[in-house]
Curated annotation (Swiss-Prot):
Record key words, sorted: Amino-acid biosynthesis, Lyase, Methionine biosynthesis, Pyridoxal phosphate
Required cofactor names: pyridoxal 5'-phosphate
Organism in which the protein naturally occurs: Bacillus subtilis (strain 168)
Gene3D superfamilies: Aspartate Aminotransferase, domain 1 (3.90.1150.10), Type I PLP-dependent aspartate aminotransferase-like (Major domain) (3.40.640.10)
Entry's EC annotation: 4.4.1.13
UniProt GO BP: methionine biosynthetic process
Lineage: superkingdom: Bacteria
Pfam families found in the cross-reference section: Aminotran_1_2 (PF00155)
Disulphide bonds in the chain: none
Gene: patB
Entry protein name: Cystathionine beta-lyase PatB
Catalytic reaction annotation: L,L-cystathionine + H2O = L-homocysteine + pyruvate + NH4(+); an S-substituted L-cysteine + H2O = a thiol + pyruvate + NH4(+)
Length: 387
């Protein structure tokens, strides 16, 4: 795969490239914000989709045992996690699954714990369903985030807390939570009867030899209180095909989740999503290995550029994913000023840190899922914005 090739995405109804005027008021800025990559999907996926297209019939379609076997094989081979096929259900996306989980495992007025700064839809899916957010803010230690377990225990002990949403690896920072962290977290949730929804959508994109630990893999007790959200969308750049696998080992919890899907008129996956998830998880490994090597090269380039050209910008080097969490607070700019500098002076679009809740002030998220040349262009634009 030639990851250096710069693919043209303008005019393809791309949110990242074609909505910049509507969303940011600029049309001449380089988009490095929303979390999809500028790479073509693996040939294994595109060829499978062509074959499905050539069949020419697109009636009602449902994932079957073959689809579940592909998910199980992937989890076993990539993460050492033996998943029971019966525990798998499917959703059009992880955000949809978050909403379904909130409806299934909480009541209106309940509190849901999240760890800011964190992925924006966590807030939306809780609040739009009439539940309340309770923050367990992450601590910054030695250039990375850490969990405040003392505060977490206090929050989980509140009887109105019924759900905890974990982001592992963490978005926006790329922090991969350690086995020890997950064990402590899981024991607290068990003790207080709190269900854990673990968003593990970035878990296939582990960098620099880091290994992902699925929360539900740690014990049967943890599995029984867990809902794991996985998907090939970030891994293989197929978010537009809308396919995710939701792993719920406990039968009663799985039934509640399925009832939420049905109540909202959501059934199965579309025909191309089924084909894509099977091809991705059964044939996508070699392509992913190449991608990870390339993303590591991009991360190293960003780190080197920032250290020499913009030493006041602090980069949280990620354990996983193609996203970079950048701290611009040393410049003393307000978040609005920082955003306007990027848009108007630098002509580059980053994701504002304030979108991720408390603790995101002064930060912006950079998407390095692009060619090295595009990344270098973006870094030069950031420098221009701050000059």
């Amino acid at each position: 795969m030639n990851f250096d090739k710069r693919e043209e995405r303008l005019g393809t109804q791309s949110v990242k490239w074609d909505k910049t005027g509507e969303l940011f008021g600029v049309t001449d800025a380089l988009p490095m914000w929303v979390a999809d990559m500028d790479f073509r999907a693996p040939e294994a996926i595109t060829e499978a989709l062509k074959e499905r297209l050539d069949h020419g019939i697109f009636g009602y379609t449902t994932p079957d045992q073959k689809t579940k076997d592909a998910v199980c094989g992937w989890m076993q081979n990539r993460h050492g996690w033996k998943v029971n096929p019966e525990s798998i259900t499917f959703s059009p996306g992880v955000v949809t699954a978050l909403s379904m989980a909130v409806q299934a495992f909480t009541e209106p007025g309940d509190q849901v714990v999240v760890q800011p700064p964190v992925y924006t839809p966590f807030y939306h899916m809780v609040e739009k369903n009439g539940r309340h957010i309770l923050h367990n803010p992450l601590l910054e230690k030695d250039g990375a985030y850490a969990i405040d377990f003392e505060d977490l225990e206090t929050k989980l002990s509140d009887p109105s807390v019924t759900l905890f949403i974990l982001c592992n690896p963490h978005n926006p920072s790329g922090r991969s939570w350690s086995r020890e962290d997950l064990l402590k977290l899981g024991e607290l949730c068990l003790e207080h009867g709190v269900t854990v929804v673990s968003d593990e959508i970035h878990s296939d994109l582990m960098l620099y030899g880091h290994k992902h630990t699925p929360f539900a893999s740690l014990s049967d007790d943890f599995a029984d209180i867990s809902v794991t959200c996985a998907a090939p969308s970030k891994t293989f750049n197929i978010a537009g095909l809308q396919a995710s696998a939701i792993i719920i080992p406990d039968r009663l919890k799985r039934a509640k989740f399925s009832a939420s899907l049905q109540r909202n008129g959501l059934g199965g996956l579309n025909a191309f999503a089924v084909t894509a998830i099977e091809a991705a998880y059964s044939k996508g490994g070699p392509w992913l290995d190449e991608l990870i090597t390339y993303i590591e090269k991009n991360m190293n380039e960003a780190e080197a550029f920032l250290s020499t050209e913009l030493p006041k910008v602090k980069m949280m080097k990620p354990d996983a994913s193609y996203l970079i969490w950048l701290d611009f607070s040393a410049y003393g700019l307000s978040d609005a000023e920082l955003q306007q500098r990027m848009l108007k002076k630098g002509k580059v679009i980053l994701e504002p840190g304030t979108k991720y809740g408390p603790g995101g002030e002064g930060f912006m998220r950079l998407n390095a899922g692009c060619s090295l040349a595009t990344l270098q262009d973006g870094l030069r634009r950031i420098k221009a914005a701050l000059s």
